[in-house]
Amino acid sequence: MEQLIHYVWKHKLFPLTGLKTTDGKPVEVIDPGLHNHNAGPDFFNAKVKIDGTLWVGNVEIHDRSSDWFLHHHEQDANYNNVILHVAESIDADVRTEQGDYPPQMQLNVPVKIREHYDELITTDNYPACYCIIPDLPKLMIHAWMSALQVERLEQKTDAITERLTACNGSWEAAYFVTLARNYGFGINGDAFETWAKMVPLQSVDHHRDDIMQIEAIFLGQAGLLELPAIPERYQQEAAKDEYFIRLQQEYRYLAHKFGLHKMDAHQWRFLRLRPQNFPHIRIAQLAHLYYQRHAGLSQLLECETVKQAKELLATQVTPYWETHYMFGAESEKNEKHLSTSSLNLLVINTVVPMLFAYGRHKGSERLCNRAFDFLEALKAENNHIVRMWKEVGLAVETAGDSQALIQLKKTYCDKKDCLRCRIGYEYLKKKDA
C-alpha cells in the first residue's frame, strides 16, 4: 500500500542503516523532506547521501517501481529533479523526461508496522486504538486534542463562509442560517438550513414588532401553513383553528407583498421526534427569538460569557404554542423553553463557530479567543462518542474535548485514516506485550 510506504518514509520508521540503492551504493536518509499532497513528487527538499555525496531534491515513492511509467512521470518535467525513487518492489528501471535515470532504493514496510496497521484497519472495535490510550503521554493527548479542536472550528468556519457566499455577503443572514440549522438538532438540520435560506430576513425586519406576522412568514415559508402538511388525524381540527386560519391569511398577504415562495413541507421529518422537537415548535421558538430583533448577530458578538450567550438564545413561544405541538393538536400547557442541554448545544454549534468565523474575518484575536474560552467553560457533551472514549480511559471534561473527539471520529476514525492521526502514529510504532 503506497500510503503506508509514504508514512514509513515520512516518519523514518525503518532501519536507518544498511540502506542501499539497487546498484549497491550506500544510502543515508538525513531528511525525508516535506510531504507534498498536491501534483508533483511526493516529498520536496529531501536530503539524502548516496555513496557519500549529499543530494538535496525531491523523492518519489511507489508500491512498484514500474508505477513510475503507469503515472507517466517519464513525460512530466516536474520529476526531473527526483534524487531518489523509493519503492517496495523494484521491477523496472525508471527515467525522467530529460532522459536521466534516478537512483532507486527498495524500502520494505517493517513487518510489525504492517501488522499494527492491519489491526487498525480491519478491527470492528471503536476506537480501534483503545488498548494504548492509558499509556499515552498526557502532553501528547492534550496537543492532539487542541489541534483537533482548531480543525473542527476551521471546518465549521468553512461551512459558514459558504453560507456567507450564498447569502450575498450578509453576515446576519449567514448567522441566521447557521442558527436555524442547529435548531434542527441533527435530524432536521438540512431542512432547517433549506428553510432559513428561503426566509427573507430584511422583510422580517419590517415586521419585527408583530410576532404573528413573523410566525406567519416563518411557518409559511416552511410550508407548514398548508392542510396537507398536517397529519390527517388533525386536519379537521386545524381547518377550524382560528390561530391557524389567521396565520394563513397573514402569510398569503405577506407572500404576495414580498413575492415569497415556500419550501416543500415533505422535507420535514417527524418520525421518532419528541413533540417538543417538532418543526412547528422549533420555528415558533425562532420566531420569538427574532421578535423585536432580540437575538441578531450584533447582540451575539456582544456576549462576553457563556451565561450571556445562553440568555440571548433562551426563548419562549406564544400562548398558542404553549398548548399545541402542531395545528389542531391541543396538549397540556407547557411553556416550551429550550432545555439547558439544548442551549449548550446551540452555544457549541452556533455561537462558538460564529465568533471564530467572524473573528477570523475581522482579524479579531479577541473574538477567536472568546470562542475557545466558551468551549472550555462548557462541560463536555454527553453522546456515544464521548462515552466510548471515556470507557477506554481518556479524560473528557470540556466541550472543547468533546468537539475534538467528534472531529477525530468523523474525520479520521470513520474513514480509517489512522495514518494522519497522532494516536494512530503511536499505535503503529508500539511495542507488543
Where in the sequence are the language-model features?
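Acidic, carboxylate-rich catalytic segments that either coordinate divalent cations
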Residues: 391-433
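Mg2+/Mn2+-dependent nuclease catalytic core
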Residues: 64-86
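Compact, glycine/acidic-enriched structural inserts
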Residues: 80-82, 86-144
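N-terminal "leader" segments that precede or initiate the main folded domain
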Residues: 1-7
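An acidic- and aromatic-residue-enriched active-site/binding cleft used to recognize and process polar
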Residues: 62-66, 89, 110, 426
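N-terminal ordered "arm"
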Residues: 7-66, 79
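Catalytic micro-motifs at enzyme active sites that drive phosphoryl/nucleotidyl and oxygen chemistry
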Residues: 32-37, 45-50, 68-75, 90-96, ...
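Hydrophobic, aromatic-lined core segments that form the binding pocket/scaffold
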Residues: 149-404, 417
